[in-house]
């Protein structure tokens, strides 16, 4: 039996071990001659870590995973987290260089403190409902957290309600665009004007950055642009929000005005949307595939060479490759700043490492018919146009007379606005990634200078510091400051600690929702009406398909053959060229309006998302049936 003093001593030892490894440890100990001995320590992998700032707090708080919202659940580097914290506008003080206090790190991921939003009843209902569209299990998890005894009462009694006035700058910036977007009789020129304005803005940022002399000055300028980026895209959001509202309103009005079932037509209207920047990127990827089909020697060279940046440059020497490279260079000019898991600024872009892109192009060149991607998209566009006319005619005929004519005009306007503005859904992230690319290049340039002074051992050291730390280091570089050995040693120790922690959490699955007391809600789907043994998720693109599963966790290492069903942990724009070959898509995370879901609908392929652990439950080669209409996957053999 241990005495109280011995228990205190043992707890102190356990805390020292936890502090040393920076994560909770399962320890084995021995007691000999009144002295404790540590025999073994290993991480407690069943516990998800809480940030230091949450520990000891008595108030009730609820946090949601930013990674699940962005459909990228891998760890995010310290630099990546700090950049996102500077960008994330809601709740951040309007002071330069201040990180957002509503964002906190847990397990090398970012979590959003949504507690302030939950204090207002109307926001609480809207927010949890909206979250289900982003990730159903996340929204349900928040609902379950609020149902825990004393949680909502605790939030309402301790948390200050957010001031409505804090939303005024956003309302002021977005409202004119909303009004103009809805009232205009020519939505396409309105859309083109918004896109042109964003192109001009990003070009000016790049030009202004190049005109600044000091590294510190450039980093501060880019930080200012990052912090104010949301105000630059408010006109874009001003026409996108009405499109999202119109989407549900179209369905509601059809149900109210029309007797017949028009579900197929409604689904067709959401497909073949011209102007979506990601769809355009995918189509141009298909064009590159067509060029490569005419150059079998170049395709074979890519496959044999490992498809790295060096092989890409050597391929230019092959006879006849000029046509491919002319188109490839144009593609990289528009999309080279995209990449896998791109919300972490640490991760390489296609222009740094084209392997994932070349992998997709060379695989498609073997299986895709020439021009098939363009023909498929044309058919989707044509069917969408026909569906628009069918819906309008049905609305007119259902009421008849003047009422029918009036309703059909309203429906036509709603459909036109939806199909014109909805393609802008991907543009905000496209331009944010363009800004990230400019910042990334500056950080790497500064890291190279720090390598020359032996402060950094490699340029990738920069990713394990925070942005404001780099601003301070850049100021010292500009002034010719001589770094002292102890100073360098301390800095490198901090970098090593950040790197070690990042690597340690790579294989840890982050929860969708966290409560401040460490509780993790684990909601589930209803199995009513679902076949026994089926994997239940959320149907986001209608249709039923049977086929061979292909589990892909890294598009740079694995490829999808024509007609296979893609099983993925998550998808971002760098993944979607794979959708060209996919018969259906199944993803571990996501909701109705997340990236993969929208692209699946536009391509007209069935999709089910938000199935936790599906990349483990389904193995490559397994014969499965995907029901995108009802939201489940059946294992057939």
Task: Kindly give the residue locations of the regions a language model identified.
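ATP-dependent carboxylate/phosphate-activation module, predominantly the ATP-grasp catalytic core
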Residues: 1-5
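Contiguous hydrophobic, helix-prone segments at protein termini
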Residues: 19-25, 48, 53, 76, ...
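Charged, low-complexity surface patches
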Residues: 6, 439, 589
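Protease-associated
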Residues: 60, 66-79, 490-577
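Short intrinsically disordered coil segments
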Residues: 53-59
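Acidic, glycine-rich flexible loop/linker segments
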Residues: 10-20, 24-25, 33-49, 549-564, ...
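Low-complexity, flexible helical/coil segments
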Residues: 59-67, 74-79, 122-128, 132, ...
């Amino acid at each position: 039996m241990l005495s109280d003093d011995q228990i205190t001593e043992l707890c102190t030892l356990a805390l020292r071990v936890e502090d040393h490894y920076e994560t909770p440890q399962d320890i084995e100990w021995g007691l000999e001659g009144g002295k404790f001995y540590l025999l073994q320590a290993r991480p407690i992998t069943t516990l998800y870590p809480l940030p230091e700032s949450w520990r000891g707090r008595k108030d009730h708080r609820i946090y949601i995973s930013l990674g699940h919202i962005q459909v990228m659940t891998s760890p995010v580097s310290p630099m990546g987290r700090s950049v996102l914290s500077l960008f994330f506008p809601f709740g951040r003080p309007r002071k330069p260089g201040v990180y957002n206090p509503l964002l906190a790190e847990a397990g090398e991921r970012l979590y959003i403190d949504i507690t302030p939003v939950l204090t207002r009843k109307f926001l609480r209902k809207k927010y949890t409902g909206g979250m289900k569209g982003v990730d159903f299990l996340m929204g349900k998890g928040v609902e379950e957290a609020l149902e825990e005894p004393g949680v909502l009462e605790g939030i309402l009694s301790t948390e200050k309600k957010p001031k409505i006035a804090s939303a005024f700058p956003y309302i002021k910036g977005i409202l004119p665009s909303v009004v103009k977007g809805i009232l205009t009789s020519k939505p396409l020129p309105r859309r083109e004007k918004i896109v042109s304005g964003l192109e001009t803005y990003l070009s000016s940022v790049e030009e202004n950055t190049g005109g600044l002399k000091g590294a510190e000055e450039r980093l501060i300028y880019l930080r200012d642009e990052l912090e104010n980026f949301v105000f630059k895209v408010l006109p874009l959001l001003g026409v996108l929000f009405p499109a999202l509202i119109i989407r549900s309103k179209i369905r509601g009005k059809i149900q109210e005005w029309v007797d017949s079932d028009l579900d197929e037509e409604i689904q067709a209207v959401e497909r073949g949307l011209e102007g979506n920047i990601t769809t355009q990127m995918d189509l141009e990827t298909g064009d590159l595939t067509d060029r490569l089909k005419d150059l079998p020697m170049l395709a074979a060279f890519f496959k044999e060479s490992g498809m790295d940046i060096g092989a890409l440059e050597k391929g230019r020497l092959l006879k006849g490759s000029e046509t491919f490279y002319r188109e490839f260079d144009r593609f990289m000019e528009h999309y080279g700043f995209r990449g896998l898991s791109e919300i972490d600024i640490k991760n390489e872009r296609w222009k740094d490492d084209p392997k994932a892109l070349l992998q997709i192009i060379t695989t498609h060149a073997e299986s895709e018919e020439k021009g098939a991607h363009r023909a498929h998209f044309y058919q989707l566009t044509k069917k969408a146009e026909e569906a628009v006319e069918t819906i309008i005619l049905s609305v007119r005929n259902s009421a008849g007379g003047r009422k029918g004519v009036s309703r059909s005009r309203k429906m036509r306007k709603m459909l036109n606005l939806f199909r014109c503005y909805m393609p802008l859904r991907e543009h905000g992230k496209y331009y944010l990634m363009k800004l990230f690319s400019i910042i990334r290049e500056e950080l790497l340039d500064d890291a190279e200078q720090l390598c020359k002074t032996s402060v950094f051992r490699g340029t990738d050291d920069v990713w394990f510091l925070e942005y404001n730390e780099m601003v301070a280091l850049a100021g010292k570089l500009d002034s010719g400051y001589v770094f002292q050995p102890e100073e360098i040693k301390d800095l490198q120790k901090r970098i090593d600690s950040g790197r070690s922690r990042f690597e340690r959490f790579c294989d840890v699955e982050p929860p969708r929702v966290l409560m401040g007391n460490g509780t993790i809600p684990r909601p589930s789907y209803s199995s009513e009406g679902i076949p026994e043994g089926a994997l239940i998720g959320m149907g986001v693109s209608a249709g039923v398909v049977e086929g061979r599963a292909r589990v892909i966790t890294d598009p740079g290492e694995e490829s999808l053959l024509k007609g296979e069903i893609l099983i993925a942990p998550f998808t971002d724009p760098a993944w979607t060229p794979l959708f060209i070959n996919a018969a259906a898509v199944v993803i571990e995370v996501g909701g109705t309006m997340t990236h993969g879901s929208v692209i699946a609908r536009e391509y007209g392929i069935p999709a089910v998302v938000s199935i936790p652990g599906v990349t483990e439950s389904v193995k490559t080669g397994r014969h499965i049936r995907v029901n995108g209409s009802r939201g489940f996957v059946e294992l057939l053999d």
